[in-house]
């Protein structure tokens, strides 16, 4: 691989030593979660009971009423002044502007000298103002649950834990996430209604998997399952649904759409963390994948597909899938097919370093190594052929790993110049989210600082023209965090 994959502004971004990391979407640990999560409560019961569980969080961030005869703080426009602006487009940081916010939206970018009557002024002290970050492959409900907790905790604790992690996610500067599988619907609702604090969630609902596929977390002792037998615990929980044949695929996809999925996640190939499906396996027939694509298309949204191999990638594209998740083993033919069909490539930094998962068995370590070697090539091919590329992390069952979210973005400057990479994690990722079309739960523009966009903003100590290292330590370097025009952190 070239030592200068990206050369914007004549800068060479050299590759360092790469060690492998791999996808964690299909760990068998999910089975442990299933056994505990829904033992005494169905998903419908949870939807009804989440309000009670989240009640202690309600109102923590409510605006204080103003003095008599004056507007409440929340009713006043907010004016950010004295700043350096990265607007999300990838253009260089600029000065000489302010950011005016009214309610949930950015309303204008007035000149630096312009006064705004009645506005609440926030002096940014010459620091960087940028859009909130977006992670397009995040597991909201499953990222921060360790194995022992999954084995021993009751349902209430698990969902309270997910709510706390949602708040931490926001405090790392991530104002939006695309959930890549799991029962996130109720948590999304609680966040939207202000019951808890967290990022915007684009939910996929349960991952759709074939029998023996990447989302089949049953034990071998559970096999075979007769047609009239009840669903497994993982299915009842809403982590994954098993579907074989076009009819079952249609049913399971339609169920997730009914529950509120903004897009559908189908598992079209093997993985590393899962025990039963080899990395090289191809999953779902083209007809089965097409059935899911058509069901999603009838609801004016799309299918994202977990897949690694060229064969699986090409099959998914032929079926109409719009976003390839992972794809680190892609070859030039399959990448050209992505380009020609306008398919997105949602890549993750699967590099075995301090942020990677540790596997005890040699088989999975070997698969992990193959994926990591492919990661380097994948970033090279994505740029060579101009593929629309999203960025995400895919942290799963790793409480310590969730804290690395920003660092996993920052370290990718070995593949991209920092401004291009920051654009990828803001406005480019927002374009990927917008593929949800009519099912988009947040229809205003995201990932940009422009009039009409959601007021999701960060004020940071850092210079994206040099590097993104400041995102590795959000507690120290993110001085202000705003979502929906509401300030959740201010240490200016």
Regions found by a protein language model. Give the residues of each.
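Divalent metal-dependent hydrolysis catalytic cores, especially in the metallo-beta-lactamase
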Residues: 161-187, 198-207, 261-274, 302, ...
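Histidine-rich, glycine-flanked metal-binding segment
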Residues: 64-72, 76-78, 85, 89-130
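Histidine/acidic-residue-rich, glycine-tolerant segments that coordinate divalent metal ions
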Residues: 183, 192-315
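Metal-associated gating/positioning segment near the N- to mid-region
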Residues: 127-193, 211-220, 287, 319
């Amino acid at each position: 691989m070239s030592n200068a994959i990206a050369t914007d502004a004549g800068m060479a971004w050299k590759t360092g030593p790469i060690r492998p990391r791999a996808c964690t979407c299909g760990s068998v640990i999910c089975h442990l979660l299933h056994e505990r999560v829904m033992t005494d409560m169905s998903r419908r019961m949870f939807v009804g009971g989440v309000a009670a569980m989240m009640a202690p969080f309600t109102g923590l961030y409510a605006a204080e009423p103003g003095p008599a005869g004056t507007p409440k703080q929340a009713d006043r426009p907010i004016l950010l002044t004295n700043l350096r602006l990265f607007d999300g487009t990838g253009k260089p940081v600029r000065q000489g502007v302010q950011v005016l916010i009214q309610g949930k939206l950015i309303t204008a970018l007035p000149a630096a000298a312009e006064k705004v009557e009645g506005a609440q002024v926030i002096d940014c002290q010459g620091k960087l103002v940028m859009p909130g970050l977006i992670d397009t492959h995040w597991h909201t409900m499953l990222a921060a649950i360790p194995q022992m907790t999954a084995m021993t905790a009751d349902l209430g604790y698990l969902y309270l834990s997910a709510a706390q992690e949602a708040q931490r996610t926001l405090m790392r500067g991530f104002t939006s996430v695309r959930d890549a599988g799991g029962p996130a619907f109720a948590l999304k609702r609680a966040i939207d209604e202000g019951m808890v604090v967290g990022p915007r969630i684009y939910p996929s609902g349960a991952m759709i998997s074939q029998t023996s596929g990447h989302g089949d977390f049953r034990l071998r002792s559970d096999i075979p399952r007769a047609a009239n037998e009840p669903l497994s615990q993982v299915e009842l929980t809403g982590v994954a649904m098993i579907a074989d044949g076009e009819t079952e695929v249609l049913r399971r996809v339609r169920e997730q759409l009914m529950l509120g999925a903004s897009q559908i996640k189908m598992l079209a190939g093997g993985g590393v963390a899962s025990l039963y499906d080899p990395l090289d396996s191809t999953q779902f027939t083209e007809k089965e994948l097409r059935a899911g694509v058509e069901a999603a298309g009838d609801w004016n949204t799309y299918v994202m597909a977990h897949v690694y191999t060229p064969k699986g990638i090409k099959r998914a594209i032929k079926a109409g899938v719009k976003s390839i998740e992972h794809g680190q083993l892609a070859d030039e033919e399959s990448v050209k097919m992505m380009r020609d069909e306008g398919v997105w490539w949602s890549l993750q930094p699967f590099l075995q370093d301090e942020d990677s998962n540790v596997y005890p068995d040699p088989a999975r370590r070997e698969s992990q190594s193959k994926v990591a070697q492919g990661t380097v090539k994948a970033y090279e091919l994505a740029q060579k052929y101009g593929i629309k590329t999203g960025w995400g992390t895919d942290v799963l069952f790793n409480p310590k790993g969730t804290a690395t979210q920003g660092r996993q973005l920052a370290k990718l400057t070995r593949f991209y110049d920092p401004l291009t990479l920051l654009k990828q994690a803001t406005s480019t990722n927002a374009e990927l989210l917008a593929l949800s079309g009519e099912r988009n739960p947040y229809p205003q523009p995201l990932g940009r600082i422009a009039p009409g966009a959601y007021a999701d903003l960060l004020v940071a100590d850092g210079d994206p023209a040099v590097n993104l290292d400041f995102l590795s330590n959000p507690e120290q370097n993110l001085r202000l965090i705003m979502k929906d025009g509401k300030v959740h952190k201010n240490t200016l």
